[in-house]
From Swiss-Prot:
One term under GO cellular component: nucleus
Top-level lineage group: Eukaryota
Region (Disordered): 1-104, 315-347
Source species: Homo sapiens
Organism lineage: Eukaryota, Metazoa, Chordata, Craniata, Vertebrata
Gene name, Swiss-Prot/TrEMBL: MAGEB1
GO biological process: negative regulation of transcription by RNA polymerase II
Residue ranges, compositional bias (Polar residues): 39-53, 89-102
UniProt name for this protein: Melanoma-associated antigen B1
Length: 347
């Protein structure tokens, strides 16, 4: 194949992957909108961050809203079409700003944000989540819209924190928050409040997967900023974000945080940890991203193919393990049925 044609094919594949990343990370855009619609409940620790931010790590803008789309920011890090990328970012920011302004004017959306924070606080305090208490939070003028407001709060809880708001009984007077993730909790985390924090795991794993199975620290912080989580600033759910992603999730073996090989000055990247590989799969993460976008995994062709290969490799490993177990069990049964013989010794 002529060299020029190969270059065109490589460029086309690169653009296709960038489009997949953009589509896959719309979930970050949505979570950013949710964050901006409701009042902030994350107390700032002070003007001086508690930890020194690494070079190149995005910081919270002063007097401006946080970045409203991670999709453009992340995809642009790999694009060599700088001018086009900048235009896409500006267009995305303009659209997001318009969307945010509209949502702030929507009192039902505002009430849903207030209710979501109320439900999270109830859970954190280990207090029952009662319908009567939720009605007290909703402004008197909008009580007739309570069902719509509750549905909005439930969607936010699912999208941002991976939580499902379930009715405890048919009467619908009490509710419980249940994790939608398959990730387990073996007791190493400090308490049950950690499972909503783990709702960030699927989006984080998704970012890493879409970025080629490793994401730079800068890329991860762009994503965190979209969620309203900033380096050195306490967050209602995640606590101190740097500690959460570089220590807590690393110690739990969900993430690996390591220096980029041969980087000088040193730069760092995030990868899936062994526990993430054990408790979820690339296909499940892709299904999560697709669901958040109203799409299917097949809408991400290259990543779908990679996820399929991962599923096949896992199936082969499981098959090999089962075969070894069958062989071991057969050998054990054969030995147990063999007659016991005792050597005879002359007197």
């Amino acid at each position: 194949m002529p060299r020029g044609q190969k270059s065109k094919l490589r460029a086309r594949e690169k653009r296709r992957k960038a489009r997949e990343e953009t589509q896959g990370l719309k979930v970050a855009h949505a979570t950013a909108a949710e964050k901006e619609e409701c009042p902030s409940s994350s107390p700032v620790l002070g003007d001086t961050p508690t930890s020194s931010p690494a070079a190149g790590i995005p910081q919270k803008p002063q007097g401006a809203p946080p970045t409203t789309t991670a999709a453009a920011a992340v995809s642009c890090t790999e694009s060599d079409e700088g001018a086009k990328c900048q235009g896409e970012e500006n267009a995305s920011f303009s659209q997001a700003t318009t969307s945010t302004e509209s949502s702030v004017k929507d009192p039902v959306a505002w009430e849903a944000g207030m209710l979501m924070h109320f439900i999270l606080r109830k859970y954190k305090m280990r207090e029952p989540i009662m319908k009567a208490d939720m009605l007290k939070v909703v402004d008197e003028k909008y009580k007739d819209h309570f069902t719509e407001i509750l549905n909005g709060a439930s969607r936010r809880l699912e999208l941002v924190f991976g939580l499902d708001l379930k009715e405890d009984n048919p009467s619908g007077h009490t509710y419980t928050l249940v994790s939608k993730l398959n990730l387990t909790n073996d007791g190493n985390l400090s308490n049950d409040w950690d499972f909503p924090r783990n709702g960030l795991l699927m989006p984080l794993l998704g970012v890493i997967f879409l970025k080629g199975n490793s994401a730079t620290e800068e890329e991860i912080w762009k994503f965190m900023n979209v969620l309203g989580a900033y380096d050195g600033e306490e967050h209602l759910i995640y606590g101190e974000p740097r500690k959460f992603i570089t220590q807590d999730l690393v110690q739990e073996k969900y993430l690996k945080y390591e220096q980029v090989p041969n980087s000088d000055p040193p730069r760092y990247q995030f990868l899936w940890g062994p526990r993430a590989y054990a408790e979820t799969t690339k296909m499940k993460v892709l299904e999560f991203l697709a669901k958040m976008n109203g799409a299917t995994p097949r809408d991400f062709p290259s990543h779908y193919e990679e996820a399929l290969r991962d599923e096949e490799e896992r199936a082969q490993v499981r098959s090999s393990v089962r075969a070894r177990r069958r062989t071991t069990a057969t050998t054990f049964r054969a030995r147990s049925r063999a007659p016991f013989s005792r050597s005879s010794h002359p007197m």
